């Protein structure tokens, strides 16, 4: 989890972790600020597959009147926190507060738009992920970004 330039969502990562933990999951959060730099490059895919059943990439990068284009920004060190393992470890992307992140992660086949970072929305998306309620409704925006890079077919 990484929030955007507004500092918009420093709590969403913790809210998501707590909701998943409450649902019975063991949650490890990737902390790019304190991790060992070599850790990213030394862990092989087999080690990661043993350690993780699922990867959830969550972004809370809200748009604003003077920031209408807000993109996912990976850490500077060779984009090391970009999910390069999506074909080996089931991976989902949850976008809070910005329905247009599909253009940044077309290689992740499960994409969920959660239009707010409120605790209510975090709890609701976890209920849907674990099957307590279904995904209903129709997106008010074009999450496929006009078929950029064939995202619909990834």
Predicted segments with their positions:
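C-terminal non-catalytic regions of proteins with extracellular/luminal or membrane-system context
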Residues: 1-154
